[in-house]
Every structure is written in structure tokens, then in C-alpha cells.
Amino acid sequence: MIVGIPKEIKNNENRVGMTPAGVNELVKHGHTVYVQKGAGENSGFPDSSYERVGAKILATIEDVYAISEMIVKVKEPIAPEYPLIRKGQLLFTYFHFASDRRLTEAMMSSGATCLAYETVELKDHSLPLLIPMSEVAGRMATQEGARFLERPQGGKGKLMGGVPGVKPAKVLVIGAGVVGYSAARIAAGMGADVTITDLSLIHISEPTRR
């Protein structure tokens, strides 16, 4: 199969649909992979890192869509990409169709087969492709919270872990899902006094087991 990885063009999106390690696996299994020039740069993957594992670099997003049977992205296509998507093409990305009627109608009209990562579900009803994003969100929440405790940011000048003679910050995490657990784990690692609340007793007990 011919797989294409375009550069993300949505504002402030710096991720790339596939790392060189993922490309390497596809190439080893006989697939051809095209990567748009600069697609991985903002994620720390220069074009050369893709070329080393067998990918071919194309200059434009139009070139990638035109040649590829399957497109692998991170974020949903935006309006300039709609005309590039064709019937029979496979498109893998986070779509979030429910919040964007125009996107939904455009994809239906295109005739492409669209797989929304956020809807992939295991037998236990977990959403494995949302877990990495949720873990990042939880960790960033704690980091940002700690930053806004600093005086220059308008905070009280309190360290998360405290210092000798000064108690650590108290952190309340509402919700013990993947995001909440990740936030709580980072806060605890920084030495904060952490409390987690959740409506589910099962969720509350999970961090303890982990």
C-alpha cells in the first residue's frame, strides 16, 4: 500500500502523523511511504530521519494526497484539504466529527473511508488511541498549575513540593480517569499533597493499584 504523511496545517499543530519508527515498520512490511517535506520537523524528526528508514520525501501536501492510497494524520483535515481527499482513499486521524458538521459532510461527499482514532474501542470499552493524548494533557495540567503558583504569574509564590519548614502545595484532582491520574501522579512526584475525587469507586482505587 502507498501511505502518505502530510504536514499538519491546522494552527498551532506541531505533531506528525507517524514517527520514523512507524515508517520503518511499514517499509519493512513492503509498503511505500511518502512524507511531505518538513512534516516531522516540529516534532524533532528531520526529513533525513524518514529517508534513512526508506520513506520518500515529497515537496507539497498536494503531491502527498495525490499519490497515496492511505493518509495518516494527527488532526482532522481543514477546508484547504477537502478537495485533495478522493473516493476510495483511506484517511486515519482524530476527526471529532460530532463537533464539525461541515467536516462530516465534506468527508461523506469525498467517498473516502475515514477512521476516527477517537472512536477506536476495545472490548472493555476503553479508548486506547485517546490514552496518549490524555496522559499528555494530565501532565501538562500539573506543570501549568505549578507555573501559575509562581509570583511572576500572579500566584502565591508556593512550590509544589514545599521546602523545609514550609508545607507543600495541596492539589485537588477532580476525576480519576487517564487525565486525572496522570495529573495526580506528576503532582505527587513533585512532592505535593494530592487528593483525587471521582464518582466511581473503581476509578478512585486504580491509582493506588498502579
Where are the predicted features?
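N-terminal Rossmann-fold NAD(P) dinucleotide-binding loop
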Residues: 180-181
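Short beta-strand "acidic-cap" motif of Rossmann-like dinucleotide-binding folds
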Residues: 35, 116, 194-198
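An N-terminal-biased, well-structured beta-alpha scaffold segment characteristic
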Residues: 2-110
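Glycine/serine-rich phosphate-binding loop and adjoining beta1-alpha1 elements at the start
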Residues: 2, 8, 77-169
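Glycine-rich Rossmann-fold phosphate-binding loop(s) that bind the pyrophosphate
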Residues: 176-177
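Gly/Ala-rich phosphate-binding loop of Rossmann-like dinucleotide-binding domains
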Residues: 27, 184, 188
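Residue-level detector of conserved catalytic or cofactor/ligand-binding positions
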Residues: 200-210
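Conserved S-adenosyl-L-methionine
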Residues: 189-193
